[in-house]
Structures are given as structure tokens and as C-alpha cells.
Amino acid sequence: MNPVEQLDERRDQTPPPMKTRTAGSRLSAALALSLSLFGPVSAQWTITDLGLLGDADGNDSQAWSINNRGHVVGSGRILTPGSAAQLHVVLWADGRQRDLGVNASSSLTGAKLNDADVVAINDGTWKPHVWQHGLLSVLPLLPGASYGGIHGLNSGGQIVGWSDSPAGGRSVIWHGGTVTDTGMMGGSFMWAMAINDSGTLAINRAVRGFNSYLVVAGTTNFLTVASVTPDGTTSVVDLNNAGQACGNFNNHVGQSAAWHACLWTGGDGIPLPEFPSGGSEAFGMNNLGHVVGYAYRGPYDAPAVLWRDGAFVNLSELPEVLAAGWSSLSARDVNDSDQVVGHGYHNGKLRAFLLSPATVPVPFHVTLRREATGATLSFVSSAGARYQVLTTTHLTATNWDSLGDPIPGSGQVIATHIPSSPETARFFVVRTVP
């Protein structure tokens, strides 16, 4: 069994701190500024059974990844005359399903897709593939390698994962039909979990359990959680375009230790809320910093949850979910409209689902412009709303400084000057206030 299979077995066994109403999250590399903006959320949801691949009774389906067009990739099991059932990769788009023509891996990251419907795939033999424009291609491995796997991709089509090699498992990037070693420091095994549109990498390294890193513009940053003990471990699982990462940590090396979901937004990871019994795990996130996974409540009781605005939504027990006959939901990914995909039992059969809020976060665009004396932050306001801009040098700070009195919205562009500051990084939040 290879290390990635061991990681998947462990995951099968076993939020930002401020409540601000915002609508997006962006990072300015030039100024090293993080802007967190959230929009209104809704308590009403609709759940859709994505259906089967084929129509043989007893088939199952699962969903792994969703893009911002609402398209979903996952797997469906089909029966072939004279042979056992096979698990195929499926793309659900615009009310239709498409068999991508490759046997699926049972891995928790069987496939990922971007907004262009490029699909990165792990097949059943640990051979990475890419499906693009209707064509399926096998991705190359490092010299001397016999197997590898994908974990993520960005809007530019860069795919990340791992490849075997004579020197051990290496984190790699595929782009344009070539494979490149990320050059990460040595270890018994390492793999890249995600890459954002700026090229930032999220990497795990198997050493004393797992250690996690972000590689930003060639600089390696060790991801820490303040509550992790010296013999604890971290495991990053996803990354967004604001440079936020989500993952998990525990305080004991080993398969039996309790895992806890966390969010990295600069500095130490912030543990995400849990039930009193403790234990949780994150699987995916969107560009708003919202995270999906599960929260452990008791034996055989781990509801699917969506973490946002410092709290979590119990997806498994939404009235709409229960009324539709669903149970045992497992949430795997979330897009920027807070649409959640995964799988659960619908009327007793395993099915892929799409869970959509009735009201989605409202797009909220912010622009940063460098100037000789600092920068200007600007955004389009809504008439009747009031906005406040807060700032700090560290996202885990308890107190944030206001840049002035609340600003009344007028339906026009609001521009706020940000003076120069000696700090290497400064963070800002734009929020609506009463």
C-alpha cells in the first residue's frame, strides 16, 4: 500500500474567527494584502440527486469536485455484461452526465475540475490522467516512476499531485503535457494537494506524521497550528485564490488520533468549530474561505458541515435534506456560490448530490492600486448600505483597527486611501454595518 492510500484510509476512519457579511476574498501580491468580503447567506436549500451512470438497479454514484459553473465531477458504477461492476469517472454539466471513459480510483480525490471543465483524474491503477475538450490523456511521471496521482488544479490548467521516483515520492506539477518536480525538500514522501491561480502550492510531507507547507513565489512557509503538540501533525487539503488554506491537525502521530479541521489565513491555523464531543475534518474550500467536511458528534455520527463566518451549518440535518429522504451525507467540495457536492444515501442507495442555497453570496469586487504614498482600496457600494474598513497586521489578532467612520453607500464607487506602513504585510476587512 502506498502512502497516499494510507492517507485515504485514515481520512475514511475517522472558521474564520470574525462574523462579517462579505462576498469575496482577494489577495494583492504587490501589497501583500488580504481582503475578506462576504455576502448574504440563506437558510433555504435545495438538494439534487445527480443520478446514475446507466440505469442498472443497484448502481451508485459519488461526487468529488464542483466548479463555479455548477458542473460536477465524480464517479458512477456501471454493470458490464459478463464482468464485475466498474467505477467510471463522470462529468455532470447542464443537466447531462458524461462518462469520461476511464476507470475511477476509489481515492477521496478521484478527480478535480476547473471552470473550463478540464478534469484531472486518478484512475484505478494510480495513473494520473487529464480530460480536456473531449480528449483523455495519460499524464507523464518522473523518470523511473511507476505510479502517481493528482490532487488539484487551477484555472490555468496546472495540475498538482505526486509521482513516484527512485528518490521516493515527490510533489509535482503537470502543465502543457510535461511533469516538473516542485523541488520541495526531501522526506519519505511528499505530495502537492492544491495550486491556486497565482501559482501558490499547498504541499504535505510525510515526516513524523505529516507536515504541511505553502510555497509562495518560491518561498516555503511552514503551516502551524498553535494548539498542536510537538508530536502532533498537520495535513493541508485545499487552497484558494486569496492564499487561504484548509486542512486538519491532530496531537498524536498515528491512525487512531482525533483529527480537527482548521483554516490558515496567515499565521497559525485557526481550529474550526466542532460539536462538544470534538473531532472534525475538512475536505475542500472556496474562494470566500468557506470550508466543507464533517464534524464528529458521536459513534457513527459525523454530520456533513459547511463552515463559514465563524460557525458551521449542519448540512446533514437541513429540513430540506431530511424531507427529500437523504441520510449520511459526506460533503467533498464547495464553489463560490456555496453549492456543495458529495454523496449520501438517498432512499437507501448511495448517490451523488448537489446541495444549493436559495440565496448565494453576492459578488463584491475590490480593487487595490499602488501609489507613491500607499494604496487605494475601492469598491462599488450599494445605496442604503454602510461599510467599514478594518485593518490589522495579523489575522489572528483580537482587535482590528478601523480606518475611519462607517462609509454610507451610494451605488457608486467608494475609494479609501491606505497610507504606507512599515509592516511587510497588512490585512483588511470590508464589512457592512447597521
Describe the residue ranges of each PLM region:
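Bacterial N-terminal signal peptides
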Residues: 28-40
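N-terminal regions of proteins, emphasizing targeting and processing segments when present
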Residues: 5-8, 393
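Bacterial N-terminal signal peptides that target proteins for export
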Residues: 8-29
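Short, composition-biased motifs enriched in small/polar/acidic residues
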Residues: 359-434
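Residue-level hotspots at or immediately adjacent to binding/recognition sites across diverse folds
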Residues: 41-362
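Short hydrophobic transmembrane-like helices used for membrane targeting/insertion
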Residues: 1-4, 18, 41
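Serine/threonine-rich, low-complexity intrinsically disordered segments
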Residues: 16, 22-24, 175, 222, ...
